[in-house]
Amino acid sequence: MKTLEEVAKALKNTYMEHEVDEKLPLIQEIQRLKKEKNAILLGHNYMTPDVFHGVSDITGDSLYLSKVAADTDADVILFNGVHFMAETAKLMSPQKKVLIADLKAGCSLAESITRQDVIDLKQKYPGVPVVTYVNCTADVKAETDICCTSANALQVVESLESDTVIFLPDRYLAANVQNLTQKKIITHPGSCMVHEMYSAEDIELTRRQFPGVTVISHPECKTEVVDRSDYSGSTSQMSDFIRKSEAKNIFLITECSMGDNLRSEFPDRHFVSTCQVCPHMKKITLEKIRDSLLYDQYEIHLDPEVIEKGRMSVQRMLDLSFKK
């Protein structure tokens, strides 16, 4: 757990000094409640800096946080992210109390597909394996052979023996995987409301304005964006790329808070962006996190059959990605 001094130092890269001073008492209260409840707070990379740096014990992308959820010894998991992420934590630790600070923190991708959609596709393409991006509900995962994240999508697809794969629900991630594999990809018209907003023109304008800028995009973006980027990867892969790179000017094509959080880790870099905000991620606030711990709200409950089947699809992914 970071000290309040360490938190304050990290937050001063994003907030005014008086804003930091206002946040610290609430952060201190959350830290106290965490210890009382033996709770672990998992924070996705798209959390605002006060949540990301201030109260999250473990931060990262969906793949890493899924593994942490499966391995934790904490009694309570509070997921600072959106609803499908908390559901995934419940799948992987069904015996734990899993909380999310706001039940309305949804996801445009998760809302784009239903369990029945998957059943219908399986009937239309019998015997074809189904790969589902983790950005979906638990009952969709329950109809899936194996899950994937943006960090391991190609690895998962290539691991399957079939020449044809059903890949759901992100059409842009599917298209970017299709460009890297010989397998035939059958997909679904889902998309991320944040990443689909970026265009090739955004990159061209930024390159003209900042000659020599390094462009890093998320694979949920359109192919025209990914193809024009210097690198494309998951949020954790973006961080790793920057850590190993000497690039000074970086155009980060993803959700706003990712850049805000990286500024604290890389104060010597200049992040330029046409920022896109995820309204769902921004529903998670310090006040709601405090109330979640204080009142044990809002707990994730899943049908036992969904847990059994959905857990298998996530576990297959983890076994593949973290095999020893």
Curated annotation (Swiss-Prot):
Binds 1 [4Fe-4S] cluster per subunit. Iminosuccinate binds at H44, S62, Y133, V134, N135, S150, H218, P219, E220, T235. Keywords: 4Fe-4S, Cytoplasm, Iron, Iron-sulfur, Metal-binding, Pyridine nucleotide biosynthesis, Transferase. It is an enzyme of class 2 (transferase). One of its GO terms (cellular component) is cytosol. Pfam families: NadA. Its EC number is 2.5.1.72. GO terms for molecular function: 4 iron, 4 sulfur cluster binding; metal ion binding; quinolinate synthetase A activity. Its main location: cytoplasm. The keyword Repeat does not apply. Pathway: Cofactor biosynthesis; NAD(+) biosynthesis; quinolinate from iminoaspartate: step 1/1. It is found in: Cytoplasm. One of its GO terms (biological process) is 'de novo' NAD biosynthetic process from L-aspartate. Its cofactor is [4Fe-4S] cluster. [4Fe-4S] cluster binds at C107, C192, C278. It catalyses: iminosuccinate + dihydroxyacetone phosphate = quinolinate + phosphate + 2 H2O + H(+). The keyword Protease does not apply. Coiled coil: none annotated. Catalyzes the condensation of iminoaspartate with dihydroxyacetone phosphate to form quinolinate. Belongs to the quinolinate synthase family. Type 2 subfamily. This is Quinolinate synthase.
